[in-house]
Each structure stands twice: as C-alpha cells, then as structure tokens.
Amino acid sequence: VPDSTNRPPGRRKLHRDRARPDGHDPANPVVLDVEGSGVQPPVAPRVRQAFWLLERVAPAIGSRWATELWCTPPVMESSLRMPPGVPPGQPLEAHWNGHRVVGEAWGEGPLVYLVHGWGGRRPHLGMFIKPLVESGHRVIAFDLPSHNESDPGALAPGRTTAIECAEAVAAMIRTHGPARAVVAHSLGANATAFAASWGATVGRLVFLAPMGEFPIYLDLFAARHNFGRRIRAGLHRRLERRIGMSLEDTNMVRIAQKTGYPPLLLIHDPDDPETPYETSERVVASWPGADLMTTQGLGRLAHFRILRHRPAIRAGVEFIGPAQV
C-alpha cells in the first residue's frame, strides 16, 4: 500500500507469495528487502509523493513514468577501474542490430567472458581477469547496452532492458568465438542464460547472485517508489510489451530449460538484500548437475562484495579449470 506520509521505505520486508503458474510454493514466500544494500541513493521524496498521487488520479501516466525509470540503469560510482595488476586490455567491440558493444581482452587461449550486472561496468568482474589469464585463457570483459562505453539499444540513451543485454552477450560470443565459460553477475547472469537459450555456445557458467525471478522486483520497485497495484499492473503490461514476452518467462528456471543445462556453479550469499538467495536455491534445484556455493558474512553489501570475495573468485576459477585440460 502506498504511503501517504511520504516516508522513506526504511528497513522493512515484503513477503511475496510464490504460488504462481510456474509451481512456486506458497508456504515458503520470498522475503524482499525494501531498503536494499544502500549502494544506490534512495528514491527522492518528491518522486515518492508524485507516485502516491498518480496511483490515485492518473495510474496510466504513473505506469509510463515507472516503465522509463525501470529501464534506466543506476549510476554507481564503485569499481570504476580495474584491480591493481590488471593492465589495459586490447580494445574490441561487437554489434547487434547496429548497436555497438565495447569491451577489452586479455591473454590468449580459450575464451572466458565476464558479464557485469545492472548498473555495473566491465571492471566489476576484474578480479577474475588475472587468475583466468594465468590459467591459460583469453578473457573478454565488456559493457552492456547503455552502460559505460557501450551504445544504447533501441531505447533512449541511458535506458535498456534485460533482453537488449542478452543481445549484447550473444553478439560478443558470436563475434569473438565460443565461450569456454562465462562468469556473470546479477542481471548479467540472466542475460547470459538468455543468450545461451538462443544458441550462443557456452561451455560452463559461473553465476554470482543472479536475478532469479524478475516479477518479484516489481514488488520492490513499487515499494521503493511508493505506488500501488494500479501503477504496478500498468508497469507489468508495459514491460511485457516492451520485451515481447511474459515476465514469468524471464525467470531463470524457465530460461534454463532452453539452454541445454551447461555445467553451472552458482555463488550467492544469504545476506544479499538485492537478489533473494531463495531464488538461487530454486535455480540450482531445477538445473541438473548445478552446484550452489553459499558464501557467509558478506553483510548488506553482499551483492557487490561477492565480486571481490576471494573464496568465491577462487571457486569460480577452479570450476572453469585450466585451459589445457
């Protein structure tokens, strides 16, 4: 229910019933953290107040505005540079439907692609570069559409969708060669799964804190922006028209059915407030042969700390294995 007092959401939880057509268990709801990690700035009070009013008097206008905000990646100032010891890579690019995707490459050997998450950029997975190069791989990291140096897609500059991000992943693999492995974070994992389901050649997958079920994020988005069911329903419809499919069909469990189930290591922390750990448990349970590595103690910044967590990095590199084997 929208808050007429215009208070910030604060530390509160939402419980989302998982009894939906894809077989979720209503006795075990997903718990959503409204405040999140705090890395992104809170929604401005004037925006929350505007959505509260639009929910009552003009939900169609509110849903149009919400759709544009949803498709706008946040600007996060963390990890703007590669880690120490990682030199500038060889510049490269790929194109899809005339849109340019910008990246860099290091080393020689079988290809491993690094795919950042929503609002990220290619340095975010930079801790994987040195050990993967040392194990005999050529490593390619790139920026998703409307992120950092890459062009926007069909939407206005500064906006994109998960489907456009998947197009970028598929274009990179198509242009530069089959992936011995892909290491992907958050929305980048979903984009990678989509690319694999479309036929991109992927040998092994390392997913860090993936966004397992997209519809649950509408609940979080509504709570953070202070709108209710009318705007949310309009946002849902508009997003489905924009991406050309049901939001339920963007759930990782459903996407995976068309990937051929390549070997998967999924790494996640139960403290992650941005992507629910429970959804990763369900992905692994549905993915034959998949392994779940549970990190501990990364706190409210777990969604981002996992990218620098040495046990997680070591596990991912070992799962991929040396290139000569």
Task: Cite the ranges covered by each PLM segment.
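Conserved alpha/beta-hydrolase
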Residues: 122, 129-152
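Conserved alpha/beta-hydrolase "acid-adjacent" motif
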Residues: 273-279
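Gly/Ala-rich beta-loop-alpha elbow adjacent to hydrolase catalytic centers
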Residues: 183-192
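An N-terminal hydrophobic leader/cap segment in hydrolases
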Residues: 5-22, 32-94
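Catalytic histidine-centered segment of alpha/beta-hydrolase-like enzymes
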Residues: 298-311
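Short beta-strand/loop motif that positions the catalytic acidic residue
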Residues: 259-260, 265-268, 272
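Alpha/beta-hydrolase active-site loop
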Residues: 157-180
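Hydrolase active-site cap/lid region
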Residues: 198-245
